[in-house]
Design a protein with these regions (language model features):
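Catalytic-core environment of secreted peptidases
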Residues: 1-35
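Buried hydrophobic-core signal for structured, non-transmembrane domains
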Residues: 6, 82, 124-133, 174, ...
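Short, small-residue alpha-helix embedded
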Residues: 33-49
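An often Trp-containing, charged/polar helix-loop segment at the C-terminal end
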Residues: 48-77
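Short aromatic-acidic-glycine turn motif
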Residues: 68-70, 147-158
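Beta-sheet-dominated interaction scaffolds and their linkers
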Residues: 88-134, 158-164, 191-202
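Short acidic, flexible loop segments centered on an aromatic residue
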Residues: 134-152
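Intrinsically disordered, low-complexity Pro/Gly/Ser/Thr-rich segments with frequent PxxP/GP/PP motifs
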Residues: 154-200
């Protein structure tokens, strides 16, 4: 399945620290990002006390901003940013939730590992996502699929539109087709093809 779920502020974050008295400390990492997400989850729970943990997670993931790029303008792939960069206001105001039908607690849909022979045939698999409208008005969405990065030999298909009436839950089929002779591994454009491994030693990062 897909991880991470979301991206959050986690670089050079000033926070409280054990043993610092009234002072704080700057840190970087998931230890700084996780409290941001926890705070947003608390806000969603306060606004929607009837939401289950899976619904709170869906509200945060569905509302995340997807236009997250590096300094060169290349967009991060889903395995680096999840569903996007957390947006507290949008998460609190989320009244339409989208999640995987088979694994609603995961929210994101994954086709898993697809293993096919090199037989020159098309192979197709379909999974459903659920769109649940808890608003008092109907919502219509245009659907599309955005690669990150593009995978030669594959072809996703989604319906062009979906409409959910107030209080309605709709299943939307997501189809993924592969043509094995053309399949090719591609690299996230935000990553370098050659990278240096680093180790954290005595408070500093050092190349291995």
């Amino acid at each position: 399945f897909i991880k991470a779920d979301v991206a959050a502020p986690g670089v050079d974050i000033f926070s409280a620290s054990v043993g610092q008295g009234t002072e704080g400390v700057y840190n970087t990492g998931t230890s700084m990002a996780a409290p941001h997400v926890s705070g947003i989850a608390a806000q969603v729970m306060q606004a929607h006390p009837d939401y289950t943990p899976a619904m709170v997670k869906a509200a945060i993931m569905n509302s995340a901003d997807t236009d997250l790029t590096n300094n060169a303008g290349s967009k991060y792939a889903v395995d680096r940013m999840g569903s996007g960069f957390v947006n507290a206001k949008k998460a609190v105001n989320a009244k339409v939730l989208v999640y995987d039908e088979e694994n609603p607690e995961r929210v994101s849909l994954s086709f898993g590992v697809l293993e096919y022979p090199l037989d020159g045939e098309d192979h197709t698999v379909t999974r459903n996502i659920v769109v649940r409208n808890m608003d008092s008005v109907a919502h219509t969405y245009e659907l599309s699929y955005q690669y990150g990065p593009e995978i030669p030999g594959s072809s996703p298909e989604v319906p062009p539109l979906v409409t959910v009436e107030p209080g309605e839950t709709v299943k939307v089929p997501i189809t993924f087709s592969t043509y094995t002779p053309f399949l090719e591994k591609t690299i996230d454009p935000t990553l370098e093809k050659e990278q240096t491994a680093m180790a954290y030693v005595n408070g500093q990062y050092q190349p291995i």
